[in-house]
Amino acid sequence: MAQAQYTGTGRRKNAVARVRLVPGTGKITVNKKDVEEYIPHADLRLVINQPFAVTSTQGSYDVFVNVNGGGYGGQSGAIRHGIARALLQVDPDFRDSLKRAGLLTRDARMVERKKPGLKKARKASQFSKR
């Protein structure tokens, strides 16, 4: 029989992560690279592992992620969101703890667009009275 496989899609800023959970040893692979190689910042790797910490399932699943768009921070948030959604398929009873930790909510904050006549979204050139 084929091994159980759970999927979830996570999004954050401009990053989209498609996550596959397979029962295993806890190895995380992002875009066919090891997570330590793909994401150099240790604090962002902690962000990725938050759903496992909340549900006490560390080391229970191998994670295969396909992520594109955004930078390291956005991609880490997208992976976290995808893992949380995939864990819901594993056990619907996880919903309460994941929701309380805020891991199922899509972070809606996006970069504000640049406005014409300004240097950036809100930065204007210095005002001169005379």
Curated annotation (Swiss-Prot):
Keywords: Ribonucleoprotein, Ribosomal protein
UniProt cross-references to InterPro entries, sorted A to Z: Ribosomal_Su5_D2-typ_SF (IPR020568), Ribosomal_uS9 (IPR000754), Ribosomal_uS9_bac/plastid (IPR023035), Ribosomal_uS9_CS (IPR020574), Ribsml_uS5_D2-typ_fold_subgr (IPR014721)
GO biological process: translation
Pfam families referenced in this protein's UniProt entry, alphabetically: Ribosomal_S9
MF GO annotations: RNA binding; structural constituent of ribosome
A single Gene Ontology CC term: cytosolic small ribosomal subunit
UniProt keyword Cell membrane, yes or no: no
Key word Membrane present: no
NCBIfam families reported in the protein's UniProt record: PRK00132.1
Similarity comment text for this entry: Belongs to the universal ribosomal protein uS9 family.
Record PANTHER family: RIBOSOMAL PROTEIN S9, SMALL RIBOSOMAL SUBUNIT PROTEIN US9M
Name recorded for this polypeptide: Small ribosomal subunit protein uS9
UniProt source species: Streptococcus suis (strain 98HAH33)
Gene (UniProt): rpsI
